């Protein structure tokens, strides 16, 4: 279980959110919503331990995150707004960098992400959407329980969004957790996703 307790965050003397508390249990996914500058990415960075809140605490499995960073990071898949891939490498080589023991599974993961036939193409030659798919192919390889995804559908077409949404649904059905930001609808998942709205210093589930 991931828990946020009374989180408070300020940026440039402006309160992004205050008194924010919620939990994400096994089998749940949460969509963080809000306008530009509402603090969506900042909240995800707090939840992953990449930044510290100005008040409150994040807990993982009942322990303060700052005390269990190693075990937490073994349980975490974080994909930020930028793909975080190496453009000099091919799609296959990028996945091998993150999952060196899964060589036999890489082609299937890339195919699931819509990159069949592009396995050995340098990422620099791929479109923005294809580069995003390289990063998201990790969803078919990772063994992490908690997925935190910042705008995963950027530059992804409708069919790709549907495929990725099905993968997230399968992950939560198996007891995994997903937290994501997106402005796009989640096809077939509207009834199962909780929404956390950040609105001008306040938040509501």
From Swiss-Prot:
Molecular function terms, GO-annotated: ABC-type heme transporter activity; ATP binding; ATP hydrolysis activity
Binding residue positions for ATP: 34-41
Topological relation to the membrane, as annotated: Peripheral membrane protein
Record carries keyword Cell membrane: yes
Self-association state and partner proteins as the record states: The complex is composed of two ATP-binding proteins (CcmA) and two transmembrane proteins (CcmB).
GO CC terms: plasma membrane
Reactions this protein catalyses: heme b(in) + ATP + H2O = heme b(out) + ADP + phosphate + H(+)
EC number: 7.6.2.5
Enzyme class: translocase
Keywords: ATP-binding, Cell inner membrane, Cell membrane, Cytochrome c-type biogenesis, Membrane, Nucleotide-binding, Translocase, Transport
Family in the record: Belongs to the ABC transporter superfamily. CcmA exporter (TC 3.A.1.107) family.
Domain ABC transporter: 2-205
InterPro entries: AAA+_ATPase, ABC_transporter-like_ATP-bd, ABC_transporter-like_CS, ABC_transptr_haem_export_CcmA, P-loop_NTPase
SUPFAM superfamilies to which the protein is assigned, alphabetical: P-loop containing nucleoside triphosphate hydrolases (SSF52540)
Protein name as annotated: Cytochrome c biogenesis ATP-binding export protein CcmA 2
Compartments it resides in: Cell inner membrane
UniProt cross-references to Pfam families, sorted A to Z: ABC_tran
Role this protein plays: Part of the ABC transporter complex CcmAB involved in the biogenesis of c-type cytochromes; once thought to export heme, this seems not to be the case, but its exact role is uncertain. Responsible for energy coupling to the transport system.
GO biological process, one term: cytochrome complex assembly
Record flagged with keyword Transport: yes
């Amino acid at each position: 279980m991931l828990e946020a307790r009374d989180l408070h965050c300020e940026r440039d003397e402006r309160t992004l959110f205050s008194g924010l508390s919620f939990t994400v249990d096994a089998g749940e996914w949460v969509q963080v919503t809000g306008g530009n500058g509402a603090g969506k990415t900042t909240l995800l960075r707090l939840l992953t331990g990449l930044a510290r809140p100005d008040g409150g605490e994040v807990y993982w499995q009942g322990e303060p995150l700052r005390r269990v960073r190693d075990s937490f990071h073994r349980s975490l898949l974080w994909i930020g707004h930028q793909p975080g891939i190496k453009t000099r490498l091919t799609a296959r080589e990028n996945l091998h960098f993150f999952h060196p023991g899964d060589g036999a599974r890489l082609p299937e993961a890339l195919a699931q992400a819509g990159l069949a036939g592009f396995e050995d193409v340098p990422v620099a030659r791929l479109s923005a959407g294809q580069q995003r798919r390289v990063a998201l192919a990790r969803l078919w390889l990772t063994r992490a329980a908690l997925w935190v995804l910042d705008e995963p559908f950027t530059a992804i077409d409708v069919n790709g969004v549907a495929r990725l949404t099905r993968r997230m649904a399968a992950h939560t059905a198996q007891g995994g957790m997903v937290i994501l930001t997106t402005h796009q609808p989640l096809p077939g998942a509207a009834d199962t996703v909780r929404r956390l709205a950040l609105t001008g210093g306040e938040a509501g589930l």
